[in-house]
């Protein structure tokens, strides 16, 4: 089952990315290194509600 999730920057808490994930394969909260245009650098982005 695929669900929509939002990724928020770990430093400035801005919600920068929307994506989909498969809950069966990834039951935990997703964490990725992505570019934050507000911080103007690559930071850890965490899944939010």
UniProtKB/Swiss-Prot annotation:
- SUPFAM superfamilies on file: Zn-binding ribosomal proteins
* Pfam families, per the entry: Ribosomal_L33 (PF00471)
The record's section on NCBIfam families has: PRK00504.1, PRK00595.1, rpmG_bact
Report the domain of life of the source organism: Bacteria
Q: Which residues form the signal peptide?
A: none
Question: What InterPro entries does the annotation carry?
Answer: Ribosomal_bL33, Ribosomal_bL33_CS, Ribosomal_bL33_sf, Ribosomal_zn-bd
What is the name of the protein in this document? Large ribosomal subunit protein bL33
- Give Gene Ontology CC terms: cytoplasm; ribonucleoprotein complex; ribosome
What species is given as this protein's source? Acetivibrio thermocellus (strain ATCC 27405 / DSM 1237 / JCM 9322 / NBRC 103400 / NCIMB 10682 / NRRL B-4536 / VPI 7372) (Clostridium thermocellum)
Q: Which GO terms describe its biological process?
A: translation
Family that this chain belongs to: Belongs to the bacterial ribosomal protein bL33 family.
Q: Which residues form a coiled coil?
A: none
Q: Which PROSITE patterns does this entry report, sorted A to Z?
A: RIBOSOMAL_L33
Q: Name one GO molecular function term.
A: structural constituent of ribosome
Instruction: Provide the alphabetized UniProt keywords.
Output: Ribonucleoprotein, Ribosomal protein
């Amino acid at each position: 089952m695929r669900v929509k999730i939002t990724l928020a920057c770990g430093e400035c808490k801005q919600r920068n990315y929307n994506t989909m994930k498969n809950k069966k394969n990834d039951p935990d909260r997703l964490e990725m290194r992505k570019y934050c245009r507000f911080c103007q650098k690559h930071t850890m982005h965490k899944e939010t509600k």
